[in-house]
C-alpha cells in the first residue's frame, strides 16, 4: 500500500499518536506525517503511506491555512491554553486597534519560536529544556506570512478569531503572543484549527474513526489518495519512456532526452509508466536524472 491519507486530527492527541493509530488500522509499518500539529490543535494532517514517505518535502514545503482564536489578557509559558500563566493584563483591545497592527505581521517577518517547540538547542529539543525549567533563548528567524485577517472579536470573552495563510516555519502561537505584546494586553492561542496544507483541504479529510470503517469495508479508494497528489505542480511524464529506459531510471541511471518539447521550461518531473509511479527526476542539459525512485 502506498499513497496519502488526508486525516482530520482531533484535539487532544499528538501527530505521532495519529501515525500510531493509522499503522494499527491499516496494518502497515511505513507511515509518516507532513507538518506537526500540536496536541491541542485540530485539522488537516497529511499522512504518507509506504513509498509516499519519500515525497514528504513536497507535502511540507507548501502554504498552510489556519483558523485560530486568541485569548487576550494572559501570557502563558507555552503560548497556548496548556501553559502556566506568567503575565496578566486588564487591558481589553479594540477591534480597530487589532486591525491597525495586523499589517506588521504580514510578509517576511521576524519571529521567535515558542520555548515549548521542537527547535533544537545544542542538540536537545527546546520543549524538553522548558519542561525541566532550564533557561535558554531561541534565536529569531524570518518567516513568510501571506495573509492574516481578523475574522471576529468578542469584548465579552476578550477573544479574537483570525484567519492565517502562511508558508513553512510559521508558529501560530508566536503570532498570538506577539500580537498580545504589541497591543499591551498579552495573548495566547485558545483554539487552533488547520484548514489546509497545500492540496490537502477540509472537503476530503476524514477522521480516524472513518478511516477504520472504510478500511474494514475494503473501501481503500475512498480514503487513499495517489502518490502524485503532492506533485501536481510538477511535470508528469506517463508512458513517455520505453521499458529499457524505465529500467535504467529504476536503477538510478541517467537518460538522454530527445523530446525536449515535453519537458520545456521545467527542472523536475514525475515519471510513471501505465500510471504506476517510477521516480522523481531532475532535468538539466537535456538529461533526466533520478532523484527519488519508487519501489512499487
Swiss-Prot record:
Q: Which residues form the active site?
A: 38 (nucleophile)
- State the InterPro entries in the record: PsdUridine_synth_cat_dom_sf, PsdUridine_synth_N, tRNA_psdUridine_synth_TruB, TruB_C
What's the EC number here? Answer: 5.4.99.25
* Reactions it catalyzes: uridine(55) in tRNA = pseudouridine(55) in tRNA
Q: Isomerase: present as a keyword of the record? A: yes
Q: Which GO terms describe its molecular function?
A: RNA binding; tRNA pseudouridine(55) synthase activity
* Keyword match Secreted: no
Q: Which UniProt keywords apply?
A: Isomerase, tRNA processing
List each coiled-coil range.
Answer: none
Name one matching Pfam family: TruB_N
Q: Which GO terms describe its biological process?
A: mRNA pseudouridine synthesis; tRNA pseudouridine synthesis
Per the record, the similarity remark reads:
Belongs to the pseudouridine synthase TruB family. Type 1 subfamily.
This molecule's function is given as:
Responsible for synthesis of pseudouridine from uracil-55 in the psi GC loop of transfer RNAs.
PANTHER family annotated for this entry? PSEUDOURIDYLATE SYNTHASE TRUB1, TRNA-PSEUDOURIDINE SYNTHASE
Q: What is this protein called?
A: tRNA pseudouridine synthase B
Q: Please report the organism this UniProt entry assigns to the protein.
A: Ehrlichia ruminantium (strain Gardel)
| Taxonomic lineage from the root | Bacteria, Pseudomonadati, Pseudomonadota, Alphaproteobacteria, Rickettsiales
